[in-house]
Structure formats: C-alpha cells, structure tokens
Amino acid sequence: MGQKVHPIGLRVGIIRDWESKWYAEKDYATLLHEDIKVRKYIETALKDASVSKVEIERAANRVNITIHTAKPGKVIGKGGTEVENLRKYLSELTGKRVHINIIEIKRADLDARLVAENIARQLENRVSFRRAQKQAIQRTIRAGAKGIKTQVSGRLGGADIARAEHYSEGTVPLHTLRADIDYAHAEADTTYGKLGVKVWIYRGEVLPTKKSVEGGK
C-alpha cells in the first residue's frame, strides 16, 4: 500500500501537518475552490521564485498565507512591491484581509518539489533524462538526504512508445509512517510531448510529537 498511496497524505496527522487550516460548514466547497485558485495564482505569478508550498490559514475576516520559497528576494521584490501587489490581488480574490508570511528554504536540494521542477526544467532544455536524474540524486545525497528516488516517464528521448525510467540511491522506506518522506511531481513540456517527473526524498525519521500522540488516543 505504501508504494501506491501519496506519501504526504499518508503521513498527515502523524508527522505532517495540514497545508490548509480552517473550518467551515456550508461554505466548505467555496473555500476549498478558493484555496485552489490562491495556490494556482501564486504558482503562476511566482513561477521563477522556486516556491515549494503554500499554507493557508483562515480566521473570521482574515487569511494568513505562508509561502515557502528558496528565493525570498524574488517574492518580496524591490522595496516590497511584488509582495504588496500579490497581497492586493489575493485580497480581491478572497474578499478578506490577507497577510503574507515568507519562509526561506535553506536547503533546496532536500525539497522534493524544487528537485522535481529542476529536473523538469533540464528536460525542457534538452538535457538527457538520465543525466538530469543522476545529477539531482548526487546533489540531494550531498545535501544530507538518507535516500532519494526519481522517475521520469513519457516519450523518453523521442521514442514512439512511452515508458518510465527511475533511479534511486540510499533507502526510501515508504511503509514507515515515522519516516520523513517528501514527495512531489512536475511536468516538462518537450517537443515530443509532456514528460512526468516524480521525486521521493527520505530525510530521516521523525518521532511524533506528544501533542499528536495524545490526539490519536
């Protein structure tokens, strides 16, 4: 089962936290679609800022958005202009006051989303899929990961029949719930069509906090 299920979804409530934190009854579907729009807009507007994830927290008339990025300078902009423009647009989109927090990702090579996007970018620049994966694996292991697995699927090298090739190093224990495994997928647009990129990174074991253990009783 651990091989098929989404590694992050499987660990939510155990060692991972929710990326959207709010409660709603009748408005649940509306707020869910609003979250999707917010995340899509941020991904599009900040596509060159190496954004890993967006956390959304809602209060009565306020929305707190936390952006995890490897390039905080690009998100903030000169004199804070970019982040202010982003805040204004998101305020119009949600109809509420928006507060934006920016958290810098210190080690981008240990973030599955950034590693997957980096491989996808290289594939778009016609780098060999084998070379792109092997270089990413070397950088991630050098950064301190316990294990990594990458997979590229599609018309590899312009072949007529689509296939998938994966490489791995170290261990990636997908069944161990206390294992801190980061997972992400990305897409590369090539002349032969789309290629899918998947990345699993094992960063070591995390013991559940006392709070989460008590909550599960």
From Swiss-Prot:
User: Keyword Ribosomal protein on this protein?
Assistant: yes
List the molecular function annotations (GO) for this entry: mRNA binding; rRNA binding; structural constituent of ribosome
One annotated Gene Ontology cellular component of this protein: cytosolic small ribosomal subunit
Q: Which residues form the signal peptide?
A: none
Annotated KH type-2 domain residues: 38-106
**How does this polypeptide assemble, per the annotation?**
Part of the 30S ribosomal subunit. Forms a tight complex with proteins S10 and S14.
Question: Which NCBIfam families does the record cross-reference, listed alphabetically?
Answer: rpsC_bact
Name this polypeptide is given: Small ribosomal subunit protein uS3
User: Which gene name does the record give?
Assistant: rpsC
